[in-house]
Amino acid sequence: MSNEDILVPAALSTHQDESDFTFQKFDSDSMERSFYLGPLSSQDELWDKLMQYYSIDKLIAYLQRNPEYVQITLQFPDTLVKDSSFIIRALQDKLDGDGAGRKFWALADTAYSACCVDEVAAEHVKGDLVIHFGDACLNAIQKLPVVYDFGKPFLDTDVLLACFTEEFKDKDQKICLMSNASYTHHIPDLYSRLKSNGYTNVVYSVVNTGLLTETAEIIDNTTPLSDTDELFTLGNRVLMGARQEEDIDEETLRNEYALFHITMPHDPHLLYLTTVFESIHTYDVADQVISNGPYPSLTRRYKNMHKARTAGCIGILVNTLSIRGTRETVNKLIKLIRENGKKHYLFVVGKPNVPKLANFEPVDIWCILGCGQSGIIVDEFGEFYKPIITPYELTLALNFEVTWTGKWIIDFQKAITEIDNSLAELGIDDSKHGNDSDHDLDAPEFDAVTGKYVSSSRPLRALNHLQLDAPSNEDKQVMARVNGGTVIKGTVSTAVEHLANRAWTGLGSDYKDDEGYEEDGATVEEGISGIARGYEFDQEDAARKSQNQSQ
């Protein structure tokens, strides 16, 4: 090929040098696995450790016992997706010869929380089984069977014990050992070593298998020690230890027990744990250090709960579609919001962030429905433009008498119970329609945060008292203002009221100030036809340029 044949890309309008593209380069093509596999010396050792980490032999045995599963989806978190090709290869090598005709699909990008089973993504390929790898919340899903493979990560227990004894010098202190689902594999051994070192008041946690449905199973799950008993159930964990004279309950944990957690929990789960234990100590397995905070606080949650009391428009943000009970929770929330005279909008958003939620300015506050382990947004630094609360906090806010208990309930079933109690307080049940309570919805309300009077906290309460005139045939006005709201074609709209009060209402809103403005709308004209490279005026311009060049 000659130099004339080499195609050179067009020069950009702005100068770019090598430094502009350094973010796309990597110093090494090796993938970092040592923090969960341990030190590696060769490629053969990598293969063996991956086989042990994922318990591939036991996973293969499960699939051989269940040949009815053909379309198998493998779900990975971001930290483990690099191992997906290895796992699929190992499964295919062992299972291709049995004649079942299995197909494997890697779900590399989950729509919602990584700890939840992405049932929606699995249904896209008509999967009949989901194998979930890594940490898991064990929330019950709607339909598909699921197999959990937590993995067995490497942990230098000698270094951990040294850090532990330095942090907890009092061997009589009451301590609870906990970790994410993957590192639970090390918890019983750590408990035994601490007991042998003289720590007398230590309890440990294991995965609560009672949450599993009949179509769910855990591969190579950790079994409790034979000389320990169940002491207390805490969500998706069961606390184990030597039988004590006094039973452990929530009050005992909150007032007497320190939590030692291997790995840093996600913010929602961490906030929940701060309301359960007297103190929190987290161990970073990568840096091998213990941290004592700062951690998320309920103080901001209390403030946002009071903001929800005077919010006129509530956005219900659904951050999960797989967890059982989501639809029931949404329906009961909508009923509770309506009975309190407030407006609501329903949004289903995968991985919500600041730009996504900023698009909906009329929303005064967000109520998020998501996994309690990692699917709830805890906006600790005020990055979002509007506050974000949970269904339980919204239920507290819409009660006529606010009672702040200091608890943080994130379980759907418990939240549904609280909503039912609030509806009962309003005099409403599933067989009734309307508000039969004696509470005065027209009573003035004041913002507990600012102390100011709020007139728009119940925008729909005036619907029963609003009298509207039927529009005449000659009336071309779409929007009408009346006492109590803004009306579009006979329907009260809080969104239009919000838009009308803005200084700038969108592109074209100032056309009425231009000459030739048509009140009935723009005149319909014939537009351009054809394809973009062959518009008629483009052809005429090209012919004109060609003629000028020939002259």
Swiss-Prot record:
GO terms for molecular function: 2-(3-amino-3-carboxypropyl)histidine synthase activity; 4 iron, 4 sulfur cluster binding; metal ion binding. Pathway: Protein modification; peptidyl-diphthamide biosynthesis. Its cofactor is [4Fe-4S] cluster. InterPro entries: DHP2, DPH1/DPH2, DPH1/DPH2_1, DPH1/DPH2_3. This is 2-(3-amino-3-carboxypropyl)histidine synthase subunit 2. Pfam families: Diphthamide_syn (PF01866). It is found in: Cytoplasm. Keywords: Cytoplasm, Iron, Iron-sulfur, Metal-binding. Belongs to the DPH1/DPH2 family. DPH2 subfamily. The gene is DPH2. The lineage of its organism: Eukaryota, Fungi, Dikarya, Ascomycota, Saccharomycotina. Binds 1 [4Fe-4S] cluster per subunit. The cluster facilitates the reduction of the catalytic iron-sulfur cluster in the DPH1 subunit. Its main location: cytoplasm. [4Fe-4S] cluster binds at C116, C137, C371.
